[in-house]
Amino acid sequence: MFRSKRSGLVRRLWRSRVVPDREEGGSGGGGGGDEDGSLGSRAEPAPRAREGGGCGRSEVRPVAPRRPRDAVGQRGAQGAGRRRRAGGPPRPMSEPGAGAGSSLLDVAEPGGPGWLPESDCETVTCCLFSERDAAGAPRDASDPLAGAALEPAGGGRSREARSRLLLLEQELKTVTYSLLKRLKERSLDTLLEAVESRGGVPGGCVLVPRADLRLGGQPAPPQLLLGRLFRWPDLQHAVELKPLCGCHSFAAAADGPTVCCNPYHFSRLCGPESPPPPYSRLSPRDEYKPLDLSDSTLSYTETEATNSLITAPGEFSDASMSPDATKPSHWCSVAYWEHRTRVGRLYAVYDQAVSIFYDLPQGSGFCLGQLNLEQRSESVRRTRSKIGFGILLSKEPDGVWAYNRGEHPIFVNSPTLDAPGGRALVVRKVPPGYSIKVFDFERSGLQHAPEPDAADGPYDPNSVRISFAKGWGPCYSRQFITSCPCWLEILLNNPR
């Protein structure tokens, strides 16, 4: 039987969903670890899209490969076919149909909605409701959407647990298919391209009518359903999502007739962190001390840039972004630093949003990969390779936002993130896929200028500092931002 292209796209999207994979001992606090580079003793995990923050972060992996694959195949193996693996030891003999000479996996039909060639992916379980990870160990009971009981310690899975898993998976598949089948072929193409590129090609908006979808007895708006399916398996509520500034849902009314369901047009909001670190002798103003103009270790370009920023910040702009006389003034300038050396010229930003990246499949902005330096340390080279899709910096009505598009965390400090009246430096960790308001216009207006005796070295109340992959401050071995291999300085020009 011939199948339409639309049904093939729907099946490919279903196979591209992600599976949570718990990491033991993971914590997203600011107290050090290998991922943020505070200790630097072990290498980073393989570059996968680890979405989430806080304790128990999840590593999410695509069920299907990112490359296009022929979706035409035969029907069949609907029950047992949902359990598939990509290599590894055979199923336990306690499972029905797992004999010595044959296996349920051996009769897999390549075109079925739940099937995958053995060499394409290391994920061995299906859907969001899997009880076991790739190594065969029982999953944590707190896994999102996993409503079934875990396997008893003394034997195989009970019939009730298997039955409930299949029901939950079938419900998710039914709700997802009902939503995707409402989309036109062009919208499905856009959605698939965004999912398979992991946001490298976010594409346009995918608009759907606001529907009363329900999953597990709970409301599941389209943006929540697809965000949970393709990016954040632990996502619980739509209020945790923030539409990006270029999305239809950003400007549309909250109760409008349509909503964008492209999961890469949304970011996840950074929630409150653990209590601030204990009092430190370092203050936010001490952070700026290494950039003091009298510091003899600064290069000529650094000193020239700092002096120029104080006297005439409007004189600097990237050559390719030189504005005409009719264009409005830039709202910020971006400086890229490697440790204590500024690399390249200041990049002036005129548009509402700008991408700052090392390697991006499609798009424009500030490409850090094109900035050359004769001598780079090994730590800088490693960190530059982790920038990837980088960040999206946007000026919005309430402030300046930074969205982490990469696969590694970023670390942010700004005057409006510091505790009012506090002297301890506050550095916020932003996991992949999350966004944070790095500069709050309202809070900035309420803050008083620092007292003269408190200002130790140059202090700019309208600047933001962002480090890629490596943290700094009281909770890390790096006390100063200039100890970070790759970081940005965002110099706001007349905030608001």
Swiss-Prot record:
Zn(2+) binds at C205, C247, C260, H265. Changing E489K: Likely risk factor for CRS7; decreased inhibition of BMP signaling pathway. Its main location: nucleus. Changing P113L: In CRS7; uncertain significance; no effect on inhibition of BMP signaling pathway. Residues 1-15 have a biased composition (Basic residues). GO terms for biological process: anatomical structure morphogenesis; aorta development; aortic valve morphogenesis; BMP signaling pathway; cell differentiation; cell-substrate adhesion; coronary vasculature development; fat cell differentiation. This is Mothers against decapentaplegic homolog 6.
